[in-house]
């Protein structure tokens, strides 16, 4: 069982490493999104560089990476405690942030982390998504909405009594904020781009 779990965790890392924004940009738009906008491989920069259609596809793909990776023990009928689903999900987040297929320079893990939560705790995902969308509607800042959504997920998880989930969501929230430190500086300086489509 231990070997199988290790192998699934490695597979989850590989799944997380799929740079959907990079590949879609190169294949369909002949653009390397790392050379434009924020230079980030995530969904937000895909929206900024490639447009709403491509950005939406990248967002869905990045969410699915987290969801599929989290459910790997279920798909392979591995008889383990369901908390181990969070382990494979965590490896997908690591893969997205430090992708094997893109020089270990990845995204900020917001969508992939959301996919992990969607697979493990769907109601928590919905609650955090609502907070994200409301914040986005009011502020027009994707970065700020992502951070507030992550913090909301952490606060809500505290009432769920699942300490393994709480620890993972706390790590996700801290990591998301850390990855957005440049965005925080730009927001404070009034230099952070706002979305125009919402």
Curated annotation (Swiss-Prot):
The keyword Membrane applies. The chain crosses the membrane at residues 5-25, 56-76, 84-104, 114-134, 158-178. GO terms for cellular component: plasma membrane. Pathway: Lipid metabolism; phospholipid metabolism. It comes from the Bacteria. Keywords: Cell membrane, Lipid biosynthesis, Lipid metabolism, Membrane, Phospholipid biosynthesis, Phospholipid metabolism, Transferase, Transmembrane, Transmembrane helix. GO terms for molecular function: acyl-phosphate glycerol-3-phosphate acyltransferase activity. Belongs to the PlsY family. Probably interacts with PlsX. HAMAP family: PlsY (MF_01043). This is Glycerol-3-phosphate acyltransferase.
